[in-house]
């Protein structure tokens, strides 16, 4: 079992890690472990994470409660099925000089580039896909779970905003075809960051107090501690 932080953005950050482990099993006492991986997943994220790992047949999801501490559920499943738990990100990341995202990989002995080299989306498109307009456009995500932020974007291009009424993966074609993408720290930001060959210009707004690793492919609008 791979037990990571369960936010949707964390699933995007750790997708490369989980794919790598599923293809290169760890060993304990000369025996492969984590050859088939169970991953706890919050109920509200089941649809998105199921799609994310649809092509990886070694991954199965354990749905856990959204509204309470899920560790007892995870530990009970581990004990009942006699499977070990690989815990990622529950210790040590607060005081490291790297971004906490990179620490997740270091905790299991992996280089951070694996986040990108092993990030994969399914070959088949999701059930719902929003078609891009014919004209050039800017894609904007200015929301988090608690509020919406006003971003000062001066452009004559058409502006398209992420809306919570649509699944996150329904925006894949819009992400790939955008001229610019503007994000606050969110699951959308971590999804966009995981792509390697986007043509869009990327803009990050450090409005939220939560720090995150911002790579050099983003232009940061405002003050932010950047990890390179």
Spans of features found by a protein language model:
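Catalytic machinery of carbohydrate-active enzymes
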Residues: 1-228
């Amino acid at each position: 079992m791979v037990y990571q932080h369960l936010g949707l953005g964390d699933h995007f950050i750790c997708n490369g890690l989980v794919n790598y482990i599923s293809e290169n099993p760890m060993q304990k006492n000369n025996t492969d472990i984590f050859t088939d991986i169970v991953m706890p997943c919050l109920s509200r994220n089941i649809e998105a994470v199921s799609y994310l790992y649809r092509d990886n047949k070694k991954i199965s999801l354990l749905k856990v409660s959204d509204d309470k501490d899920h560790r007892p559920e995870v530990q009970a499943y581990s004990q009942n099925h006699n499977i070990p738990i690989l815990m990622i990100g529950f210790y040590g990341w607060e005081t490291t000089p790297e971004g906490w995202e990179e620490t997740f990989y270091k905790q299991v002995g992996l280089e951070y580039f694996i986040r990108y080299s092993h990030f994969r989306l399914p070959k088949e498109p999701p059930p719902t896909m929003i078609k891009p307009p014919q004209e050039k456009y800017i894609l904007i995500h200015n929301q988090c779970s608690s509020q919406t932020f006003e971003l000062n974007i001066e452009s004559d291009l058409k502006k398209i905003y992420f809306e919570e009424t649509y699944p996150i993966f329904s925006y894949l074609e819009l992400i790939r075809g955008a001229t610019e993408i503007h994000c606050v720290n969110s699951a959308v930001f971590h999804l966009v960051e995981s792509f390697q060959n986007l043509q869009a210009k990327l803009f990050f707004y450090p409005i939220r107090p939560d720090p995150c690793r911002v790579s050099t492919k983003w232009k940061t609008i405002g003050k932010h501690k950047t990890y390179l």
